[in-house]
Amino acid sequence: MRRKTIAILLCFAVIAGLIPNKEVMNVTAKEKKVYSKSVVKANNYSDYEEIKTPEDMDKLNYVVDGKYCLSADIDMSEYEGTYKPAEGFRGVLDGRGHTIKNLHSVVFDSIVGSATVRDLKIKNSNIGSDDYGKGFLINTIDFAYDGLKGKILIENVDVEGKADVSKYQKGESGSFAGICSYVNIHKETQSVKINNCSVNIKMSTDTGNYAIYYGGIIGGTTRNSKSTLEISNCVSLGSIKSSDTDSMVGGIAGEADYVNTTNCYADMEL
């Protein structure tokens, strides 16, 4: 039997259905601006490796524990099918408010250990059935390798794009989301925090898959009560249209065991 969970989360002392949509989003945008001012600090980028061209994006794969910053907007429109998402990343990517646009794949295939991704915009991503990666920003956050420990922070990231995964991994389980498709953490020494992020995405799926998790912020999780997974001050807009049997769909998370969600808002067509 088809199951869908619709996660529309608000941490306000009001009922969302009684508030005009425009008013809610105006309040959210105002608060989001305040959060940004409080968390974005002046930074000395002298020890950061610059990313200013599409070719520079490959640097994320060279030194996976390095510190990188964008010094310009990046247009990936001519790199369809050739960009290889970073694997095993455990460094820092500071977007400095810049935009990566016209991507046809996820930015990171996997993030492990301690890592930070902040102050970044993803715009006009177009993920097709044959394109690499599951998601827009991160495919998997995975602490399973070698019992890794640490803290992962995803902060001040805005994602806008569309995805058609109707033919992707037909007949298999999986997940898809705006920020991170799957989070795998188990120990009390491991934590993931997603703060002050927003997505405006359109996803369509018809894969015949089972146990599929589709979410605005995260897709699915494997974790227990000892580890920490926190989603705070996030906004999710757009649509997720799935005819997959036994799929789990949510505006914030498709499947979210032991996830702490605070002050988040979703307005998605599911």
Language-model features: locations:
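Sec/Tat signal peptide C-region and signal peptidase I cleavage site
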Residues: 22-28
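Hydrophobic core
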Residues: 10, 14-18
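Positively charged n-region of N-terminal signal peptides that target proteins for export
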Residues: 1-8
